[in-house]
């Protein structure tokens, strides 16, 4: 349908601009030639980016308006996560992929991770045969000198190494975890280390914040992190923080949601997060949630379901960091003394419970951020502190605009589903549901879950995007293996 005709059928006769970009204004005007001319004039005055934003908002608010005008039973159906259909879509993908996926031949560990993690988020597991097949396949992707390639016999690469390790951790159990060669992995990570402090994605490959994060995430999970891997890393990531506040892929690049998550998580894992300008980072991150209630990846870009995780996770991490440092969400003042004591008492109890075996690792400097606190989700956002993003609005966008009723999730309306967006939409949905999480054993309140408890997903470990139970199992396993 021509754009102008579709707009007239929506009775839209005007546009307005505000701080969040192009918004539509619905007016109940006529459908005559004068209306057509006004719409044509409005459209001709817009840039390509404005037109694209306008059309996305039309689609999104059309869905929202339909939902709001529907009866209760229809609303309930639209808001349901449709677990059975999601699992059917995921299981089919794990067993057999069509020829259209041949272009992703170098990303096969990613497909394993995206699908297995999505299944785990839904609280389900795969059968023994599928588990054994996945472990065997990923074992054939493991290089003879460490790391994992995109497929059997392919060049080891940090991105697919991260995906393979996360997939095996998600499967869990001795067979999966013991299949990872920690000694050769340590050698591989050292080989990827650059003298600048950063990491290269593969031998002679590009260097960016993705490489830094994936290397440190793997080293942290496998308990092989040391000073050689972390030396100079904070300097490199710090050089990638932009004037906007977010983090780019490399020095001088534009701030981007995915790189911001990678940079922030890596800095927390190496206990150097205080070196970042957290106020500026927080300001940039919260302004990426637009009128659609989903997140965009960069300034003046369209909403995308995958940033449900890449942007919401940094928002929660930052707010927990402020709680740890006794600041409010703006970092400009201290929270009340009583709340401060309550936080520290809770934190210390959790740390004593979780880290009895290695008290020497505790940081005695009360002003520094301890990565263990974020690791074990022992710091939480007090109810007296308002969330810095709209968690219910974000869930609304994912469930109404990204979810496909027959299974899977997508970028935005009119886009097809895929396993990548399914993984990160579900991951972000979990982050939004558990944003108020007091500890990993406390379920969120009903009011924090759009659609009720039937939509509740498993909580994720925010620094690795692994379901908490599997993360805890892996940490214990690799602690004993050291």
From Swiss-Prot:
Question: Protein name, please?
Answer: Protein farnesyltransferase subunit beta
User: GO:BP terms for this protein?
Assistant: cuticle development; negative regulation of abscisic acid-activated signaling pathway; protein farnesylation; protein prenylation; regulation of meristem structural organization; regulation of response to osmotic stress; regulation of response to salt stress; response to abscisic acid
| Matches recorded under InterPro entries | FTB (IPR026872), PGGT1B-like (IPR045089), Prenyltrans (IPR001330), Terpenoid_cyclase/PrenylTrfase (IPR008930)
Q: What is its EC number?
A: 2.5.1.58
Q: Which GO terms describe its cellular component?
A: protein farnesyltransferase complex
Q: Family membership, please give it.
A: Belongs to the protein prenyltransferase subunit beta family.
Question: Which residues of the sequence carry a binding annotation for (2E,6E)-farnesyl diphosphate?
Answer: 256-259, 298-301, 307-310
Q: Which UniProt keywords apply?
A: Metal-binding, Prenyltransferase, Repeat, Transferase, Zinc
**Sorted alphabetically, which Pfam families does this protein's record hold?**
Prenyltrans
- Give me the disulphide-bonded residues: none
Q: PFTB repeats span which residues? A: 131-172, 182-223, 230-271, 278-319, 391-433
Task: Kindly list the cofactors needed.
Answer: Zn(2+)
What does the entry comment about cofactor binding? Binds 1 zinc ion per subunit.
Extract the ranges annotated as region (Disordered).
329-372
Relate the assembly described in the record: Heterodimer of FTA and FTB (farnesyltransferase). Heterodimer of an alpha and a beta subunit.
Catalytic activity, as annotated: L-cysteinyl-[protein] + (2E,6E)-farnesyl diphosphate = S-(2E,6E)-farnesyl-L-cysteinyl-[protein] + diphosphate
The residues that hold Zn(2+) are 304, 306, 421
Give the top-rank taxon of the lineage listed in the UniProt record for this protein: Eukaryota
The top EC class is transferase
- GO molecular function term, any single one: geranylgeranyl diphosphate synthase activity
């Amino acid at each position: 349908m021509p754009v102008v005709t579709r707009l007239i059928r929506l009775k839209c006769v005007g546009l307005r601009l505000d701080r969040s970009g192009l918004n539509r204004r619905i007016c109940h005007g006529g459908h005559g030639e004068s209306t057509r001319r006004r719409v044509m004039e409005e459209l001709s005055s817009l840039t390509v980016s404005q037109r694209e934003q306008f059309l996305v908002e039309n689609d999104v608010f059309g869905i929202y308006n339909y939902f709001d005008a529907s009866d209760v039973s229809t609303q309930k159906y639209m808001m349901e996560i449709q677990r059975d259909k999601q699992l059917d879509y995921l299981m089919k993908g794990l067993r057999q992929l069509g020829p259209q996926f041949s272009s992703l031949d170098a990303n096969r560990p990613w497909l394993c991770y995206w699908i297995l993690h999505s299944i785990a988020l839904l609280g389900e597991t795969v059968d023994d045969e599928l588990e054994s097949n996945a472990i065997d396949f990923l074992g054939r992707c493991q290089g003879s000198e460490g790391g994992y390639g995109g497929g059997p016999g392919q060049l080891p690469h940090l991105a697919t190494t991260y995906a393979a390790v996360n997939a095996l951790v998600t499967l869990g159990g001795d067979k999966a975890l013991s299949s990872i060669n920690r000694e050769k992995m340590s050698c591989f990570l050292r080989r990827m280390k650059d003298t600048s402090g950063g990491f290269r994605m593969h031998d002679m490959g590009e260097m960016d914040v993705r490489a830094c994060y994936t290397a440190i995430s793997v080293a942290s999970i496998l308990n092989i992190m040391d000073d050689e891997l972390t030396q100079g890393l904070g300097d490199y990531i710090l050089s990638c923080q932009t004037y906007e506040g977010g983090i780019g892929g490399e020095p001088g690049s534009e701030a981007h949601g995915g790189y911001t998550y990678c940079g922030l998580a890596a800095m927390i894992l190496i206990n150097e997060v205080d070196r970042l300008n957290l106020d500026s980072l927080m300001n940039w991150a919260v302004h990426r949630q637009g009128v659609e209630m989903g997140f965009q990846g960069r300034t003046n870009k369209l909403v995308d379901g995958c940033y449900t995780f890449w942007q919401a996770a940094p928002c929660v991490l930052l707010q927990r960091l402020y709680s740890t440092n006794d600041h409010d969400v703006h970092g400009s003042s201290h929270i009340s003394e009583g709340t401060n004591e309550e936080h520290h008492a809770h934190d210390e109890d959790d740390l004593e419970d979780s880290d009895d075996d290695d008290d020497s690792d505790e940081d005695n400097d009360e002003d520094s951020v301890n990565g263990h606190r974020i690791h074990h989700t022992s710091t939480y956002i007090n109810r007296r502190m308002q969330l810095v993003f709209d968690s219910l609005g974000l869930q609304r966008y994912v469930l109404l605009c990204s979810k496909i009723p027959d299974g899977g999730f997508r970028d935005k309306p009119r886009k097809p589903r895929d396993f990548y967006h399914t993984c990160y939409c579900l991951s972000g949905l979990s982050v939004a549901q558990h944003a108020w999480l007091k500890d990993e054993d406390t379920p969120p309140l009903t009011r924090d879950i759009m659609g009720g408890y039937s939509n509740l997903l498993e909580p994720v470990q925010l620094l690795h995007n692994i379901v908490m139970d599997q993360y805890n199992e892996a940490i214990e396993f690799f602690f004993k293996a050291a």
